[in-house]
């Protein structure tokens, strides 16, 4: 059962060459996910304007996710491998530490949004939509970060 789908291939569309458009498609998909995450949170803030319904401190999860998005994508894969980043104040180790801190912020924001969802909304007798908005905002920013970081190729720039 381990090699069940080893020889399975999806039928390829011959009319579009995806290898040339991989960076554009990954960037557009990541941008749509990032925009949708913030749009859901802004919608929840408009629908539930009172702090009793949606605490304004819950926006910090999305802010830290956005900060982590920029931190993670500021470091190229070549810098992490050490191919193109030999000089500088910290070099390859600094790039890896920066990327690690970015992923810690991203996972921390995602976990905090789940905590907000269950701690402030699911266990209480209130509307769950603001908690879902906080969670989906962070989840969509998380997936957009992964797509933007690992969905693009860097060979075109060298």
From Swiss-Prot:
Keywords: Acetylation, Endoplasmic reticulum, Golgi apparatus, Membrane, Transmembrane, Transmembrane helix. The chain crosses the membrane at residues 28-48, 56-76, 98-118, 128-148. It is a multi-pass membrane protein. The modification N-acetylalanine is found at residue 2. It comes from the Eukaryota. It is found in: Endoplasmic reticulum membrane; Golgi apparatus membrane. It holds the Pfam family UPF0220. Its main location: endoplasmic reticulum. GO terms for cellular component: endoplasmic reticulum; endoplasmic reticulum membrane; Golgi membrane; plasma membrane. GO terms for biological process: late endosome to vacuole transport via multivesicular body sorting pathway. Belongs to the UPF0220 family. May form homotrimers or homodimers. This is Transmembrane protein 50B.
């Amino acid at each position: 059962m381990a090699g069940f789908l080893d020889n399975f291939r999806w039928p390829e569309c011959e009319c579009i060459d995806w290898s040339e458009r991989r960076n554009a498609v990954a960037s557009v998909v990541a941008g749509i996910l990032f925009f949708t995450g913030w749009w859901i949170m802004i919608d929840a803030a408009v629908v539930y304007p009172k702090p009793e319904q949606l605490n304004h401190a819950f926006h910090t999860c999305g802010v830290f996710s956005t900060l982590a998005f920029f931190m993670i994508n500021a470091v190229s894969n070549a810098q992490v491998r050490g191919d193109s980043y030999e000089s500088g104040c910290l070099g390859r180790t600094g790039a890896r530490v920066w990327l690690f801190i970015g992923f810690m912020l991203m996972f921390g924001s995602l976990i905090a949004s789940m905590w907000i969802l269950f701690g402030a909304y699911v266990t209480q007798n209130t509307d769950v939509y603001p908690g879902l908005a906080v969670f989906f905002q962070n989840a969509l920013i998380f997936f957009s970060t992964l797509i933007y970081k690992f969905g693009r190729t860097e060979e075109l720039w060298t």
